[in-house]
UniProtKB/Swiss-Prot annotation:
It is found in: Membrane. GO terms for molecular function: acid phosphatase activity; protein tyrosine phosphatase activity; receptor tyrosine kinase binding. Homodimer. This is Testicular acid phosphatase. Disulfide bonds join C158-C378, C213-C311, C353-C357. Glycosylated. The chain crosses the membrane at residues 393-413. The active site is at H40 (nucleophile), D288 (proton donor). Its main location: membrane. Keywords: Disulfide bond, Glycoprotein, Hydrolase, Membrane, Signal, Transmembrane, Transmembrane helix. GO terms for cellular component: membrane. Residues 1-27 form the signal peptide. It is a single-pass membrane protein. It comes from Mus musculus (Mouse).
Amino acid sequence: MAEPGSQGHTVGPLLLLLLLLLPRALPEGPLLFVALVFRHGDRAPLASYPTDPHKEAASTLWPRGLGQLTKEGIRQQLELGRFLRRRYKAFLSPEYKREEVYIRSTDFDRTLESAQANLAGLFPEAAPGSPETDWKPIPVHTVPVSEDKLLRFPMRSCPRYHELLRESTEAADYQEALEGWTDFLTRLGNFTGLSLVGEPLRRAWKVLDTLICQRAHGLDLPSWASPDVLRTLSQISALDIRAHVGPPRAAEKAQLTGGILLDAILSNFSRTQRLGLPLKMVMYSAHDSTLLALQGALGLYDGNTPPYAACMAFEFRGSSREPEEEDGENVTVSLIYRNDTSRPPLPLRVPGCPAPCPLGRFQQLTAPARPPAHGAPCHGSYEPASPPATVPLLAGAVAVLAVLSLGLGLLAWRPRCLRALGGTV
């Protein structure tokens, strides 16, 4: 019998059963594979607005042009690369090896340059300042923006995605929030010279982007751009992002956006393991929208925009437990998010799974957000699923195996054919 006052420490049969049924975190084993998705570094504003007091001096303030990577952005990516070198020093070879690391970027100057700066920190021999005899340039792969469905997504070209977005923006809670900001957007339109009421919220976001970039570079903001105004603009931006990656129909949106990248990451790992390839790391240099869509697909969007050089890591590890336990799962997935250089990276947990998460459970939980095998509907037909986004090294290995299989098949077929024709074996 329990002593008085000790009832709170008694575990009943039902509670014990619930505890046993809860997903359990597995001990982390050796690192097998890493996928990194990071935002480009600090850049110039993407645009200006009619009454921008710094508009006339733009060519002086941003000598490389609007939207281009700044010196601070280069420094941020160099520092991120050095952080990655420290974290994965024991996992990666000291020098770049093409069979171990693959880098993909969107086809924008700022992301291509960010990838190069990052690699200069990760592999110092890739730094332009290295002695000429030691300098080893590292390839960064890309595809035209119009063809990029891995890191840019079919947002503008996909009718089905626009149907889903329209459903979100016509929802009662969205319209109610928007109505509450009508007076604010009217005043902001008067201040900026832009028409903002009844227009896509991205136009208001561009004002916020310009102000944030200018403030970060020590420029004076207009008197109307108070902290309260910037805070309200951030809230409007968060509403717009939720409409793009959140409910309703968040899973179907993800199948056309971040779920494509998530599926490619899982496919790259599984093929690497199945084929016994030496590939260890895949790096994606992209945008805040890429990370936001990926967070949406994982159910991890928290209302905040990823800062410059923010990085999400998918770390696949072998479990140290016996593979015959439970469902035979012996691989775990850990999600790491680095969004602040002054603090250690944050461990993330996919809803419904402990950290680290068993790979099978991770695949099960994220399946609704990933494109089905036949692809996700877009133009009345189907967008292809992940195979086109697979790292070419893996695709090449599959092709080689296919050729070998075909060759072996022909060798096996030839004697039977010759026998049928009465020829010699």
